Amino acid sequence: MSRFWSQVVRDLTPYVPGEQPKIANLIKLNTNENPFPPSPRVVAAIQAELGDDAARLRLYPDPNADLLKAAVARRHTVSAQQVFVGNGSDEVLAHIFMALLKHDQPIIFPDITYSFYPVYCGLYGVEYQTLPLADDFSINPADYCDRPNGGIIFPNPNAPTGRLLPLDAIEQMLKANPDSVVVVDEAYVDFGGETAISLVDRYDNLLVVHTLSKSRSLAGMRVGFAVGHAALIEALERVKNSFNSYPLDRLAIVAAVAAMEDEAYFAQCCHAVMATRNTLTAELTELGFEVLPSTANFIFTRHPQRDAAELAKALRERNIIVRHFKLPRIDQFLRITVGTDGECKALTDALRQITG
């Protein structure tokens, strides 16, 4: 702590990102990265943008990222005026907390959810209230329909549980909260869920957030976007242009466009992850683990007779890293990224040895 710190900084409990260790021969299943590389079109687009001498890098990128907005609009059958883009979905979410979540009433989100939400509340002075998930870790939409609030936000599928809320439940929330923005954070929806973007033309209080880090294999480029009513998007643009007018660099823009346009590769990778997830779920169940239903690129699991922290430690000793959260209700669970078939086999072989 320094005497130069502001009171906001003194009061903050910062977000703790997933570990990015520099260990040789590591099987890294802790941060939900895609096990497959980006589309070959992404590599070609980056090379074309660089050219022979990378001279374009001396120039600022398009502050509006119009090419990317157009690609997102085409993909989701909306207008470009309904699309906002940012430096990863985390930046998009940060602007949402500043621009659209009311500060005169508490916002609401699940008690077990993406841990960046309370961090943003602390940073921007937003009051919040958490609502408990059901015993099966599902979200009960009725809980979000009978109380005043300054906004609603939740991941769908939820993180770190992987459980999906159907569109009719989201509509129930939207109808019950016409004067609050409902933010659906769909970082993992491409692995078996149905996007709520289909609802944005019917509800002016809906904002849907996506990332290209997971299903498009671009975690290293940091690209995210939001889709919603044009008035919501304008609010985000106003905050963005008061914070950083150039959030996406030239290479990120062309890489993201290429990734959005290669539908065949996208579908191939998503289907492969889903197939491996199903196999991993079956094998863990055979080993005695309880596995929550998942529509994400990870699974959330516990062993009824083995301590989760000890399991994570034993896996790490075998150069396999998974995520363990030291939080109430979930401290006996592990979140395991769906890796390649080979990585998941190494994981289950190790767990068989540890628990056998």
UniProtKB/Swiss-Prot annotation:
It comes from the Bacteria. GO terms for molecular function: histidinol-phosphate transaminase activity; pyridoxal phosphate binding. It catalyses: L-histidinol phosphate + 2-oxoglutarate = 3-(imidazol-4-yl)-2-oxopropyl phosphate + L-glutamate. The gene is hisC2. InterPro entries: Aminotrans_II_pyridoxalP_BS, Aminotransferase_I/II_large, HisP_aminotrans, PyrdxlP-dep_Trfase, PyrdxlP-dep_Trfase_major, PyrdxlP-dep_Trfase_small. Homodimer. Belongs to the class-II pyridoxal-phosphate-dependent aminotransferase family. Histidinol-phosphate aminotransferase subfamily. It comes from Dechloromonas aromatica (strain RCB). This is Histidinol-phosphate aminotransferase 2. Pathway: Amino-acid biosynthesis; L-histidine biosynthesis; L-histidine from 5-phospho-alpha-D-ribose 1-diphosphate: step 7/9. HAMAP family: HisC_aminotrans_2. Its EC number is 2.6.1.9.
